[in-house]
Curated annotation (Swiss-Prot):
The gene is Chm. Signal peptide: none annotated. One of its GO terms (cellular component) is Rab-protein geranylgeranyltransferase complex. GO terms for molecular function: GDP-dissociation inhibitor activity; GTPase activator activity; protein-containing complex binding; small GTPase binding. It is found in: Cytoplasm, Cytosol. It comes from Rattus norvegicus. Keywords: Cytoplasm, GTPase activation. Residues 616-634 have a biased composition (Polar residues). InterPro entries: FAD/NAD-bd_sf (IPR036188), GDP_dissociation_inhibitor (IPR018203), Rab_escort (IPR001738), RAE1_2_domI_C (IPR054420). This is Rab proteins geranylgeranyltransferase component A 1. Belongs to the Rab GDI family. GO terms for biological process: blood vessel development; intracellular protein transport; protein geranylgeranylation; protein targeting to membrane; small GTPase-mediated signal transduction; vesicle-mediated transport. Pfam families: GDI, RAE1_2_domI_C. Most abundant in the heart, brain, and spleen. Lower levels seen in the lung, liver, muscle and kidney. Extremely low levels seen in the testis. Residues 156-208, 603-650 are annotated as: Disordered.
Amino acid sequence: MADNLPSDFDVIVIGTGLPESIIAAACSRSGQRVLHVDSRSYYGGNWASFSFSGLLSWLKEYQENNDVVTENSMWQEQILENEEAIPLSSKDKTIQHVEVFCYASQDLHKDVEEAGALQKNHASVTSAQSAEAAEAAETSCLPTAVEPLSMGSCEIPAEQSQCPGPESSPEVNDAEATGKKENSDAKSSTEEPSENVPKVQDNTETPKKNRITYSQIIKEGRRFNIDLVSQLLYSRGLLIDLLIKSNVSRYAEFKNITRILAFREGTVEQVPCSRADVFNSKQLTMVEKRMLMKFLTFCVEYEEHPDEYRAYEGTTFSEYLKTQKLTPNLQYFVLHSIAMTSETTSCTVDGLKATKKFLQCLGRYGNTPFLFPLYGQGELPQCFCRMCAVFGGIYCLRHSVQCLVVDKESRKCKAVIDQFGQRIISKHFIIEDSYLSENTCSRVQYRQISRAVLITDGSVLKTDADQQVSILAVPAEEPGSFGVRVIELCSSTMTCMKGTYLVHLTCMSSKTAREDLERVVQKLFTPYTEIEAENEQVEKPRLLWALYFNMRDSSDISRDCYNDLPSNVYVCSGPDSGLGNDNAVKQAETLFQQICPNEDFCPAPPNPEDIVLDGDSSQQEVPESSVTPETNSETPKESTVLGNPEEPSE
């Protein structure tokens, strides 16, 4: 039970986002006693992934969170004369301007329920009503652990798939509503007809596109794993290197991004980026191929030839490209699809650096620089939580912390008081930014991220192979607006049901998410209508469902901006608007070195045969019964193994 928690730890981590989870894993691995809590009912915070009904429940939760604020003054009675309290926020204000639209046919029936649900899900066309019906089914389902990486086969030895999961209080066991592995729940094979569990990898084209209804989306809701934040992993990025170094990669599987796309003059086209792609491309003339290869070769070595770009350091990368004898076609590809930088704000050096990073990541695991975790980005925080739990970390979801207790004389935080009034002592405190109160953050200036999540019935660029994972950059059109990043996921990524695509749009906010992103949605997709459903000649993919929201970007905020934080309280930011995860890893390593300055950051775990258990250790051992994961019967055959074919980049 939560009220039986130990009262003394070395590190208390509040929030289960990616940076916090990495720090928790690193501290636990170095021998620290770690308590990891989250007031939410799911892992990941704003890095989480949800099934469709789980997402509707999340929307309802935010609606209720904005309407009702509960005050608990129990903690005030425990503050001594030589202490003062820093209250924490009980209201999450990181999500704003939520708008939901359903375009799919809403032929709902009373008996429509999510596949595998224990209770009927009476769907409705409004998100709030749908969430209410889905909540009972969603919260009754436990996400299973992620099994080790495999490639070429979806059969995994039983002993390999027994990965320890975070030890938790009973709140955790009935609360993990993120729906990561509910797609592969073993109950599906016994409770559902076999035709409801299609194979995940099927590249054969369907002769005729079937009409997709909202009822189908609800029923197949567990096939969806919808990320709140849309990012990819650079194959030579800091996160991939950390996953390999720490051996946390065995808890996850990945899929290559198969296409880099460009949107130019109203048309979506594929961008050749590797040497083989360039010379096999039919879009480029032979002269353009030579120009492009010459320029890309220079970009890889640009730091060795400073005289080539020194005169343009004060100009934008776009202006610099115009001086490099590149055709307008090539300039567009390099600027928007390879460097993925702004036409008006990115300087020459930043553009060259981004291009070099892109090119260096080519070929490590595929023909593009990027990987995507199967079942969504929300897997990544859970992988590191699993590592923390293996080394004794204790986990409690739905467990809020009321305040930090600060010693007036030393000005250091000495304890926290939780929702049950229990005082828990610790030496160090890691807290995610969203838990800080308005008083603590009164001087902080936050940016915002505009996000859209779409369910569509086809790809933005049709090819013979339907299982494509694509990234597309749409440049800004108006002064003051920002370019939009589009990531399109197929069903083999285990993020959507067969016959649909899950599309994420992201940009820095200038207005509300809908105002920022709707123009791009209208260019790429056609809203679903009954008439067009019968028309097989529709050029654009049809939009079935859309969600818009703004998310707070708390990255790159100086510690000095927070009011009166004790020196042993460390703040982690939420997701940023960048494509990769490097910021989260840098932040986690920096904070870890402040806590454990002489320790290695997330080293590989020792060989099990070399582990000697200390009977007097205060680290709690994870019970065997709590670490047996459910096996995943739907692992795609074409997943990628994170090995170490070459030395990780520095």
